[in-house]
Each structure stands twice: as C-alpha cells, then as structure tokens.
C-alpha cells in the first residue's frame, strides 16, 4: 500500500517579506490551516516576531520553550504565533527562548 501525504504550506507576509512555512501534522497546525487566511498586527520581543490570533489550542505533549531557527511556534496561553530568529530578552547564551512552552 502506498500512502501519499501532501504537506500543507502557508505564507506569512510581514511588510515586504514573505515566509513560506510547512505545517507539521499536528492538531494545532490543522487548526491554523482551517483558520486561514487571517490578518494580525506584528509585535517584536527581542529577536522574535509574534502576532495574536483568535485561535484556541491546548498545549501539546511535545511543546517546548527553546526552539531552533526557522521553527514556527503557537503560544496557547497568549493565543499568538511566534517566529523566533534570535535571542529574546530571556535567552541564555545564543538560544532562542520563548516566553512559555509553545506548540511547534
């Protein structure tokens, strides 16, 4: 048997920049996919861009607060999507540390 799963992709537009992201196969990613398109104002926290959404999702078992460059996170307690690209005010050394555990 051959199963084919097409990876879902979406585009995040921030001013004159476009970021195409591949969504993981998670409940949170599916929730985001079903809510597209939506708009929000961006905010900065150190070297993190985040924007609020109207989405509600529970914290997933593999949620984490330290991410790798290029990972997109959903912050359930803040109802926001975060894109960390460098140090935040609470980072230690060169890590990308988010304010709280987030779904990746």
For the regions a language model picked out, list residue spans one by one.
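Glycine-rich active-site loops that engage anionic ligands at enzyme catalytic sites
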Residues: 25-31, 35-104
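Long, hydrophobic N-terminal alpha-helical segment
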Residues: 1-39
């Amino acid at each position: 048997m051959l199963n084919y799963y097409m990876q879902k992709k979406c585009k995040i537009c921030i001013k004159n920049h476009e970021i195409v992201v591949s969504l993981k196969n998670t409940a949170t990613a599916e929730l985001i996919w079903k809510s597209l398109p939506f708009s929000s104002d961006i905010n900065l926290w150190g070297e993190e861009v985040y924007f609020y959404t109207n989405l509600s999702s529970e914290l997933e078992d593999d949620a984490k607060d330290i991410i790798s460059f290029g990972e997109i996170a959903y912050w359930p307690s803040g109802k926001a999507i975060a894109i960390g690209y460098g140090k935040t005010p609470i980072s230690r050394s060169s890590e990308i540390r988010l304010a709280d555990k987030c779904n990746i």
